[in-house]
Amino acid sequence: VPNLTETAAGLVAPRGRITLTRHTIEQEHRHLDSTGDFSGLLNAIATAVKIIANQVNRGGLAAPADRLARASNEVMTAETLWGGHLAATASAASGGIVAVPAPYRRGKYLLAYSPLDGSDGIDVNQSAGTIFSVLRTPRPGADPRIEDFLQPGTEQVCAGFALYGPATMLILTTGDGVDGFTLDRDIGAFVLTHPRMRVPEQTREFAINSANERFWEAPVRRYIGECLAGRSGPREQDFTMHWVASLVADAFRILTRGGVVLYPADSNPGRPGRLRLMHACNPIAFLVEQAGGRAGTGRGRTMELAPARLDQAAPLVFGSRAEVERIERYHGEPGDESFDGSLFNVRSMFRAG
């Protein structure tokens, strides 16, 4: 017997699981001018994610990590170009754009993506993922150009990431909150399991690659130093530090447990950041902001940056709002030298031995 419920209008409707397909169609029904292109694009992305997840889950049985990364890029391109929803794609793996070829119809959306973030850790069974960002093409019907993609993150229509871990998950925002879907392999569909995700406000966790400490600017050194000082320091509480070198894993942890993740600017002006603005920073920033958190460069909002190049890099600091705002405040204070490293007895904050 189907699991049914009576609606306010007296109609009988299914009350079962909400799949990604049903979710996106219901979202589109709220817009009278909707053509169905957007839900079609999301379904194509979901199909690509399922294929990539199957390859990743096979690990070394399928291919080495570098071949998996190339294969993931090919899957994303192949599954999204033919449906008539896109004008072009831009992959972090290729560095350029791929226009929808004839005879396929060109749509009104642009897709920027990182096909397999964290692929370097696959050989040690670490979680990897796919990050994507959807924009509207500024010149519908015209041959797409790289310049069409150079829009600030505030122009994103949709952003999300897939996480290939113990479960395959798809985290998504269309500008109205963040929802998490888990792949149910029995039915072959993504099912809503984490509705209306919110970044916890109170947190005592942070993530940063301490191997790059020598490149950090003074405000970042100050923030990390205060966290490491624990109860005896100015924060008067103990913090937990972690680092997995997987942006998607860190982003999911932020959405579920709170905290702050830092990919800070380097003191070297020739390297302003370590992550791609269009393919990684903007989509993660959109998700975090829609979940009530904050994402920035340490000095300002990530999504307000005006990209000059498709491969432009940027710093990224994201997580619980209060922690990100504290880091921004430290960057705004004059001097930026208030942190005294001698409190830790050695030049590094991470004491040896």
Role assignments for model-derived ranges:
Residues 1-63, 68-89, 94-353:
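IMPase-like, lithium-sensitive Mg2+-dependent phosphomonoesterase catalytic core
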